[in-house]
UniProtKB/Swiss-Prot annotation:
GO cellular component: mitochondrial membrane; proton-transporting ATP synthase complex
Entry function: Subunit 8, of the mitochondrial membrane ATP synthase complex (F(1)F(0) ATP synthase or Complex V) that produces ATP from ADP in the presence of a proton gradient across the membrane which is generated by electron transport complexes of the respiratory chain. ATP synthase complex consist of a soluble F(1) head domain - the catalytic core - and a membrane F(1) domain - the membrane proton channel. These two domains are linked by a central stalk rotating inside the F(1) region and a stationary peripheral stalk.
Transmembrane portions of the chain: 13-35
Organism of this sequence: Myxine glutinosa (Atlantic hagfish)
Protein name: ATP synthase F(0) complex subunit 8
Assembly: Component of the ATP synthase complex composed at least of ATP5F1A/subunit alpha, ATP5F1B/subunit beta, ATP5MC1/subunit c (homooctomer), MT-ATP6/subunit a, MT-ATP8/subunit 8, ATP5ME/subunit e, ATP5MF/subunit f, ATP5MG/subunit g, ATP5MK/subunit k, ATP5MJ/subunit j, ATP5F1C/subunit gamma, ATP5F1D/subunit delta, ATP5F1E/subunit epsilon, ATP5PF/subunit F6, ATP5PB/subunit b, ATP5PD/subunit d, ATP5PO/subunit OSCP.
Length: 54
């Protein structure tokens, strides 16, 4: 039974293709919570386009 040996580039691309949406999903769900709790009120009230009003 010959063992399949995929190229490391293909393996890395596949793992990135699988993990990247999951990481973005977890970031988009966890980042606003941490921003809301950890940022001081001065930074919260400043108009920052990267902080989305969740």
């Amino acid at each position: 039974m010959p063992q399949l040996n995929p190229s490391p580039w293909l393996l890395m691309a596949l793992s990135l293709w699988v993990c990247f949406p999951l990481m973005m999903l977890s970031l988009s769900s966890f980042l606003p919570l941490t921003l809301k709790t950890s940022l001081p009120s001065t930074l919260k009230s400043s108009p920052n386009p990267w902080i989305l009003p969740w």
